[in-house]
UniProtKB/Swiss-Prot annotation:
Description of what induces expression: Repressed by brassinosteroids (BRs) such as brassinolide and 24-epi-brassinolide in a BRI1-dependent manner. Induced rapidly but transiently induced by chitin, a fungal pathogen elicitor.
SMART domains membership: RING, RINGv
Mode of membrane association: Single-pass membrane protein
Protein name (record): Brassinosteroid-responsive RING protein 1
Bilayer-crossing regions: 15-37
Tissue specificity annotation: Highly expressed in stems, rosette leaves and siliques, and moderately expressed in roots, cauline leaves and flower. Detected at low levels in seeds.
Keywords (A to Z) from UniProt: Brassinosteroid signaling pathway, Developmental protein, Membrane, Metal-binding, Transmembrane, Transmembrane helix, Zinc, Zinc-finger
A biological-process GO annotation: response to chitin
Function: May be involved in the brassinosteroids (BRs) signaling pathway and regulate the growth and development of rosette leaves. Seems to prevent over development of leaves and inflorescence stems.
Domain of life according to the entry: Eukaryota
Annotated zinc fingers (RING-type), start-end: 94-137
Compartments it resides in: Membrane
């Protein structure tokens, strides 16, 4: 059993067309009521909407967050060749951009987890208000420096007194 082959092919489009016709009729009635009440200004059909497809998908950030600036002060920037002379076992490439490290390149050496990254790669990561290693998620700020970091961040925020003076109500 079942439906005849042509039944669904005709039924669904016909139902769709009837639904659209009913919606069009309701629209006409609503517009007529608005015109009758003198509210036709609210029915501007000439309204042009901005074309958001021509805008860039993301507006680039122009400033770094305070926390990123403070973390940059904490994390050392050194040349890669200085680390190679120290005799430590170092990765061959940056885990963010996957380019190899070269002797004169500036890198940031994370104190907590000992990972290294190109300076520009890690700075871009911090500009997005990230406060952990991109590889292992260990916090950038060592535990022994966390209190000092929080105080400097509080001072940089511009809020000098969090607590309001208590006044009596009459």
């Amino acid at each position: 059993m079942g439906f005849p082959v042509g039944y669904t092919e005709v039924f669904l489009p016909k139902l769709f067309v009837q639904t659209l016709s009913i919606l069009g009729f309701i629209r006409t009635i609503v517009f007529s009521i608005f015109r009758f009440l003198g509210l036709s200004d609210f029915l501007e059909m000439d309204q042009t909407w901005p074309d958001y497809t021509s805008y860039p998908t993301r507006i680039p950030e122009t400033r770094s967050p305070f926390s990123a600036l403070l973390i940059r002060e904490i994390l050392p920037v050194i040349k890669f060749e200085e680390l190679t002379n120290s005799g430590e076992d170092l990765p061959e490439n940056c885990a963010v951009c996957l380019y190899e490290f070269e002797g004169e390149q500036e890198i940031r050496w994370l104190r907590n987890c000992r990972h290294i990254f190109h300076r520009s790669c890690l700075d871009r990561w911090m500009d997005h208000d990230q406060k952990t290693c991109p590889l292992c998620r260990t916090p950038f700020v060592p535990d022994e420096m966390q209190e000092e970091f929080n105080q400097r961040l509080w001072a940089a925020s511009g809020v000098h007194d969090f607590h309001c003076p208590v006044t009596e109500l009459l």
